[in-house]
Amino acid sequence: MGGTSLDPALAEIGKKNGLLVWRINKFVLEPVPEVDHGVFYIGDAYIALYQKYDGCWDVHFWLGKNASTDEIGVAAIKTVEIDDSLGGIPTQHREIQNYESPLFLSYFPDGIRYVSGGYESGYRHVDDQFKNWKPHLFHCKGKRNVRCTEVECEVNSLNLGDVFILDLGKDLYVWMPPESGRLERIKGMARAKNIADHERMGIPKVHILDDVEWDNDSTFWSYFGGVSSVRKVSKGKDDDDNYWKRLTEQITLWKVSDASGAAKVSMVSQGENIRKEQLDPKDAFILDAINGGIFVWIGHECTLEERSKALIWGQNYLKQHHLPRWTQVTRVLESAESTQFTQWFRDWVDEKKKNTFTPLLFQVSDESGLLHVEEIANFTQEDLDGDDVMILDALNSIYVWVGANANANEKKEALNTAKLYLEKDKLPRHKKTAIDTIFQGKEPPTFKKFFPSWDDNLFKNEVRSVQNMRRLLFH
């Protein structure tokens, strides 16, 4: 490892596989205990380092929506320090609250929770944390990637389509109205149990308000104006889905010029004309992959200073092209490119790797007539949700997996959804890519091979039902 004055807080990096997380606390890097992984204060900035194996690292630079400019600056400096100490080869990712990448979210299987304020505003001592407790309400939204965001503790914050957690300190209420989804319910219960058992030493009691109790529990409703207030709760809300945005645009490769001190970009090529040979080791390039995010590629002849500027160049590109600040920005280095980057080049062949494309899994739901698509990173068979339709993209084959409990419209439109996905997608693939429809419980070997392991019995029992998970979590 390089660097002679490594921050003591970074002493464990590179020593073992897995996840390390730090927060910026009073401009100092502070390790986050494993028990608090997945909890983010929206007034702070964080750094996460994931080591898949020695020599394969991903560094994520997370920004809360209320993080100060100074904290963001410290996080950026420390990210460069981590990068330098690991030989300058980690892939760097910029993460924005509410718009985190599927890869980042995959590190937290129970979902993530946003807490108001900064770390200093939170109670950290069991002895006094329940004094003068004020109720907190968390809105748990999402399918596989569940985010629990703190909202105003009032009836107008509730809706019938999502799960909410009412945090009363020594009591936690998981409110699961009829229209909420199976996975949201399971993740909501798991998050409440994690708060009770790990964050608060097992002191709080968890109350589950499901199809029977959701509209009549007097204690829960006392914080929202009484049981009669249930009539004021709105129906489920559909968020504007970002997946299909910008899909009419062309993927573009840009060359970065920083000679004048102000980074400028010039177009190199677009669409199917993008080639690996256009990447010059002496320069930096930006690949705008539309929904695939922004990649800043750094040639191996670039200086350390240029390596450290990569994410800044990416942010400047967003401003210059009037793109949302939450657009994913990832830095990749020559000879250490991930398949998430190389997949956009039709002619990219990596002799070191057997595969130049990593299969992608998407969850597709149509609960109220609005199509919602959500990518699942590091997927397993467990991620196949029987309530929905899933799309497995294997580049030259598209599999539409239809869950047994998908609604009638989802089943009817499954093939059309896959055709729309293929039509809008920008990946360089065979023009005659096949689409196969597969039904839950009847998966062929050609489909199963894309999963790390497969258990034919997984779909034959009720192990993944909400009631069974409730028994397992709160027996």
Swiss-Prot record:
<keyword id="KW-0677">Repeat</keyword>
<feature type="repeat" description="Gelsolin-like 3">
    <location>
        <begin position="275"/>
        <end position="341"/>
    </location>
</feature>
<comment type="subunit">
    <text>Monomer. Binds to actin monomers and filaments.</text>
</comment>
<dbReference type="InterPro" id="IPR007122">
    <property type="entry name" value="Villin/Gelsolin"/>
</dbReference>
<dbReference type="GO" id="GO:0008154">
    <property type="term" value="P:actin polymerization or depolymerization"/>
</dbReference>
<feature type="repeat" description="Gelsolin-like 4">
    <location>
        <begin position="375"/>
        <end position="447"/>
    </location>
</feature>
<feature type="region of interest" description="Actin binding, actin severing, Ca-sensitive">
    <location>
        <begin position="1"/>
        <end position="131"/>
    </location>
</feature>
<dbReference type="GO" id="GO:0005737">
    <property type="term" value="C:cytoplasm"/>
</dbReference>
<feature type="repeat" description="Gelsolin-like 2">
    <location>
        <begin position="148"/>
        <end position="208"/>
    </location>
</feature>
<feature type="region of interest" description="Required for synapse elimination during development">
    <location>
        <begin position="106"/>
        <end position="147"/>
    </location>
</feature>
<dbReference type="GO" id="GO:1905808">
    <property type="term" value="P:positive regulation of synapse pruning"/>
</dbReference>
<feature type="site" description="Cleavage; probably by ced-3">
    <location>
        <begin position="388"/>
        <end position="389"/>
    </location>
</feature>
<feature type="region of interest" description="Inhibitory for phosphatidylinositol 4,5-bisphosphate binding activity">
    <location>
        <begin position="248"/>
        <end position="348"/>
    </location>
</feature>
<dbReference type="InterPro" id="IPR007123">
    <property type="entry name" value="Gelsolin-like_dom"/>
</dbReference>
<keyword id="KW-0963">Cytoplasm</keyword>
<dbReference type="GO" id="GO:0003785">
    <property type="term" value="F:actin monomer binding"/>
</dbReference>
<dbReference type="InterPro" id="IPR029006">
    <property type="entry name" value="ADF-H/Gelsolin-like_dom_sf"/>
</dbReference>
<feature type="region of interest" description="Actin-actin interfilament contact point">
    <location>
        <begin position="70"/>
        <end position="73"/>
    </location>
</feature>
<comment type="function">
    <text>Calcium-regulated, actin-modulating protein that binds to the plus (or barbed) ends of actin monomers or filaments, preventing monomer exchange (end-blocking or capping). Binds actin but does not nucleate actin polymerization, albeit slows down elongation by blocking the barbed ends. By promoting actin depolymerization, required for the elimination of presynaptic components downstream of the egl-1, ced-4 and ced-3 apoptotic pathway during larval development.</text>
</comment>
<protein>
    <recommendedName>
        <fullName>Gelsolin-like protein 1</fullName>
    </recommendedName>
</protein>
<keyword id="KW-0117">Actin capping</keyword>
<feature type="repeat" description="Gelsolin-like 1">
    <location>
        <begin position="27"/>
        <end position="105"/>
    </location>
</feature>
<dbReference type="GO" id="GO:0051016">
    <property type="term" value="P:barbed-end actin filament capping"/>
</dbReference>
<feature type="region of interest" description="F- and G-actin binding, Ca-independent">
    <location>
        <begin position="240"/>
        <end position="475"/>
    </location>
</feature>
<feature type="region of interest" description="Required for phosphatidylinositol 4,5-bisphosphate binding and regulation">
    <location>
        <begin position="133"/>
        <end position="227"/>
    </location>
</feature>
<dbReference type="GO" id="GO:0055120">
    <property type="term" value="C:striated muscle dense body"/>
</dbReference>
<dbReference type="Pfam" id="PF00626">
    <property type="entry name" value="Gelsolin"/>
</dbReference>
<dbReference type="GO" id="GO:0051015">
    <property type="term" value="F:actin filament binding"/>
</dbReference>
<comment type="similarity">
    <text>Belongs to the villin/gelsolin family.</text>
</comment>
<dbReference type="GO" id="GO:0005546">
    <property type="term" value="F:phosphatidylinositol-4,5-bisphosphate binding"/>
</dbReference>
<keyword id="KW-0009">Actin-binding</keyword>
<feature type="region of interest" description="Necessary for barbed end capping activity">
    <location>
        <begin position="1"/>
        <end position="239"/>
    </location>
</feature>
<dbReference type="GO" id="GO:0051014">
    <property type="term" value="P:actin filament severing"/>
</dbReference>
<dbReference type="GO" id="GO:0030042">
    <property type="term" value="P:actin filament depolymerization"/>
</dbReference>
<dbReference type="GO" id="GO:0015629">
    <property type="term" value="C:actin cytoskeleton"/>
</dbReference>
<keyword id="KW-0206">Cytoskeleton</keyword>
<keyword id="KW-0106">Calcium</keyword>
